[in-house]
From Swiss-Prot:
Protein encoded by which gene: rplB
SMART domains membership: Ribosomal_L2 (SM01383), Ribosomal_L2_C (SM01382)
Designated name of the protein: Large ribosomal subunit protein uL2
Subunit structure comment from the entry: Part of the 50S ribosomal subunit. Forms a bridge to the 30S subunit in the 70S ribosome.
SUPFAM superfamilies hit by this protein: Nucleic acid-binding proteins, Translation proteins SH3-like domain
Organism whose genome encodes this protein: Streptococcus agalactiae serotype V (strain ATCC BAA-611 / 2603 V/R)
A biological process from GO: cytoplasmic translation
Family designation: Belongs to the universal ribosomal protein uL2 family.
Length: 277
């Protein structure tokens, strides 16, 4: 999709851009694959804020996406390419030959009328899903499982992709979007191609109201709060932090402290870290 530029008729429209939605083929989603979503506004079951900066925004229906792609040997036809308000990627409605309908992530290059299939014998073609062990070295993939049969957990955002680097025993080496090289079981599935809608990251929001439409509330700096609300708060005028290091609202170190579990079992599966040259 291309980027749409607006004339600066107001300050909000100045520098504002949006997607032109040229790839979208319908505005009407498949009703059988919709689930209602309740707006939690970042609150838990006690009504307390557990995730800040959430609330408001447009009502949405959740689209049930097939992340497992486990209907082996059953061909499907792409019927529509649709917008999904719950993710950055577009989605595609596919009709299987046995009558089942499903949504999948729409990879770059997938077109209406195209036929796709899943299984170990599937061709290396955009939209097809195979076990990692059956995918040749150098192939660009997305929608990757971490546990066989659980459903894809990696490389699902718009424009994201990974690459198969090789095979070591029952594991396959995959270079992720971040540059991290990781070993993943060869029986885990992945889909061929890059996730579509890659220009989504180039959109300039332009005004605060567009973020409010998305359910994103303002982020207030700790330094302008009172000391009972934030460790950075208080003081006369623009006071410094007053601590050895910046803190979160709950007093924990912020900005740079590593939060990964040092005993994470998946450490042994990471061949190269994302920040290594």
């Amino acid at each position: 999709m291309g980027i749409k530029v607006y004339k600066p008729t107001t300050n909000g429209r100045r520098n504002m851009t949006s997607l032109d939605f040229a790839e979208i083929t319908t505005n009407t989603p498949e009703k059988s694959l919709l689930v209602s979503l309740k707006n939690k506004a970042g609150r838990n079951n006690n009504g307390r804020i557990t995730v800040r900066h959430q609330g408001g925004g447009h009502k949405r229906h959740y689209r049930l996406i097939d992340f497992k792609r486990n209907k082996d040997g059953v061909e499907a036809v792409v019927k529509t390419i649709e917008y999904d308000p719950n993710r950055t990627a577009n989605i595609a409605l596919v009709h299987y030959t046995d009558g089942v309908k499903a949504y999948i992530l729409a990879p770059k290059g997938l077109e209406v009328g195209q036929r796709i299939i899943s299984g170990p014998e599937a061709d290396i073609k955009v939209g097809n899903a195979l076990p990692l062990a059956n995918i040749p070295v150098g192939t660009v993939i997305h929608n990757i499982e971490l546990q066989p049969g659980k459903g894809a957990e990696l490389i699902r955002a718009a424009g994201a992709s990974a690459q198969v680097l090789g095979q070591e025993g029952k594991y396959v080496l995959v270079r992720l979007q971040s540059g991290e090289v990781r070993m993943i079981l060869g029986t885990c599935r992945a889909t061929i191609g890059t996730v579509g809608n890659e220009q989504q990251s180039l959109v300039n929001i332009g005004k605060a109201g567009r973020n409010r439409w998305k359910g994103v509330r303002p982020t207030v700096r700790g330094s302008v709060m009172n000391p009972n609300d934030h460790p950075h708060g208080g003081g006369e005028g623009k006071a410094p932090v007053g601590r050895k290091a910046p803190s979160t609202p709950w007093g924990k170190p912020a900005l740079g402290l590593k939060t990964r579990n040092k005993k994470a079992k998946s450490d042994k599966l990471i061949v190269r870290r994302r920040n290594q040259k």
